[in-house]
From Swiss-Prot:
InterPro entries in alphabetical order: FluC
Species this chain originates from: Rubrobacter xylanophilus (strain DSM 9941 / JCM 11954 / NBRC 16129 / PRD-1)
Molecular function as annotated in GO: fluoride channel activity
UniProtKB keywords: Cell membrane, Ion channel, Ion transport, Membrane, Transmembrane, Transmembrane helix, Transport
Protein name: Fluoride-specific ion channel FluC 1
Length: 124
């Protein structure tokens, strides 16, 4: 990795983290604390974005690095998903914990697939 690519990827990852914090917090505030909607939203949007990127530019190494491994990796959060799911389960909210895991996986796979198809279509 060239120094410029490293710098861009680091900056993009930082920007993704800030965007996750802002969007996740906004969604959580709007939807309420009963379910981790903010994390679900950022992870689904991240999957959609990665699908779009992979579909539109599957061989553009620099773009995949900066936007995929940088921005979108900083934006999405597996660890928060696990923590929020564990918190729901230990609070006796096992149905919500299960819904969080299954819903995130299903929505993430759907968003990734839809994004990849849309990206490939847009790229021609």
């Amino acid at each position: 990795m060239a120094p410029a690519e490293l710098a861009l990827t680091l900056a993009a990852a930082g920007a993704g983290s800030v965007l996750r914090y802002l969007l996740g917090g906004w969604v959580a505030h709007r939807m309420g604390p009963e379910f981790p909607w903010g994390t679900l939203a950022v992870n689904a949007l991240g999957c959609l974005g990665l699908g779009l990127l992979q579909g539109a530019a599957p061989h553009d190494r620099a773009l995949l690095l900066v936007l995929g491994s940088g921005l979108l990796a900083g934006f999405t959060t597996f660890s928060t998903l696990m923590l929020e799911t564990a918190n729901l389960a230990t609070a006796g909210e096992r149905d919500r914990a299960f819904s969080n895991i299954v819903g995130t996986l299903a929505l993430g796979l759907f968003a990734l697939s839809a994004g990849a198809r849309a990206g490939a279509w847009a790229a021609g």
